[in-house]
Amino acid sequence: PDMVVHASLPQGKETRGARKFLSCLWVSSKSAAISHTVINRFGWWLPPGIWPDEEDQFRRLVLSLWRDGARSFVLNSPWQVGLFTTEMLDDEKASFTAGPFCNISNPATVNVLKDMGFTAAIVSPELGSRDFLELPRLSPLPLGMVLAGCWPVGMSRYGTLGVRLNEPFMSPKHEAFWARQYGENTWIYPAWQLNLSAHKAELEKAGYSFFVSMQENIPASLPPVRRPGLFNWDNSLM
């Protein structure tokens, strides 16, 4: 099914799950502490930047989620399969998707991911239309893509000197951005969102199996920006 990645913990009816899409949460100590009775209703996304001093913590979180019934995981760096045991990876009821931060752009990469135990993959959101439309035909795994939402332009382990978190700041070209802290990393977002929804039918015809919406709690002070959100759709992959 399609995925909706939430930026914060769901409340009330949001914990019941939905038939049309899979609600997903980022793996953290806070998210893993939700009621054990609803953990299996969510997909669980591992952050792309897990540092050596955090590995043991995330390994414990993954094990805890697994014991409570979680079976749908999205890994945003290929090495993260090492956080799972062989028994987990061999479980036929489990799904291990290579996430969009794995920067998947060609079928050779997907072949390697399949050999590593991944069951599906989400391609890089920064491809051009030609590459987007060509990949599913050549892929050995079911493919998904980020269709809409907040996609970061970068992330850093270091602080944002001179920039306040959760408030807009301007680039030298007078483009608005904002930053938010997640764990040890600072994520930097543009004021405009990715939006390829107008091309959904074309992408479905090309062979994409599912689509992803990435939600964020956008700062109220962020100025409105009129941009189509196509990112590199009209460009070629360099």
Q: What role is predicted for each listed range?
A:
Residues 1-112, 116-238:
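Active-site pocket-lining/capping segments in soluble small-molecule metabolic enzymes
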